[in-house]
A protein has these predicted regions:
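Short aromatic loop motif centered on NTY/YTY
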Residues: 69-138
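Structural signature of eukaryotic scaffold interfaces centered on beta-propeller domains
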Residues: 28-38, 88-97
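Short hydrophobic/aromatic-rich beta-strand segments that constitute the beta-sheet cores
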Residues: 21, 31, 43, 67-70, ...
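Short, hydrophobic/aromatic-rich segments at coil-to-beta transitions
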Residues: 15-19, 39-44, 99-102
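Terminal domain-start segments
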Residues: 1-34
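Short beta-strand segments that buttress and anchor functional surface loops
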Residues: 19-22, 45-50, 103-108
Length: 138
């Protein structure tokens, strides 16, 4: 379908509780409905910029699209304490088939002696399961 900017938005995946849209070649949005302990749900949205390294932002909403505090539902996600001596990106992806989340932290640390010297990039992958209304590290 044509979006408001004149580009094409593609719905790439759709299940009963998950959707993935590509708005441009370099941006996507994932949405997942996650059950709470009562009969309600929260909606998890992950916005990701794909170039040059994927970098994501996660938000939560109630069933009426009112914003909810992210720290309540994903308090242990990595990458929130990014220091000035390292550059990091956090790529978050939701599972279309299960209430799980994959968080990949990519970072490079630069030496202070030479701005052009880069230490070996490090990548860390974390898996989270949705349990009792919050994402919990496996």
């Amino acid at each position: 379908m044509t979006n408001r900017l004149g580009g094409t938005t593609i719905l790439s995946a759709l299940t009963d509780d998950y959707a993935l849209w590509h708005y441009t070649a370099s941006s996507q949005v994932e949405m997942k409905r996650l059950p709470l302990t009562d009969s309600t749900s929260v909606i998890c949205l992950v916005h990701t910029v794909l170039l040059p390294e994927p970098d994501s932002h996660i938000d939560f909403y109630d069933e009426h699209w009112q914003p909810l505090p992210t720290e309540h539902y994903a308090s242990t996600l990595p990458g929130t304490n990014r220091s000035s001596s390292s550059l990091s990106t956090l790529h978050i992806s939701l599972s279309p088939d299960a209430p799980t989340l994959k968080a990949e932290l990519h970072w490079e640390t630069y030496t202070m002696k030479d701005e052009n010297a880069v230490l070996t990039p490090a990548n860390e992958t974390y898996w989270y399961d949705w349990k009792e209304g919050t994402f919990t590290l496996r």
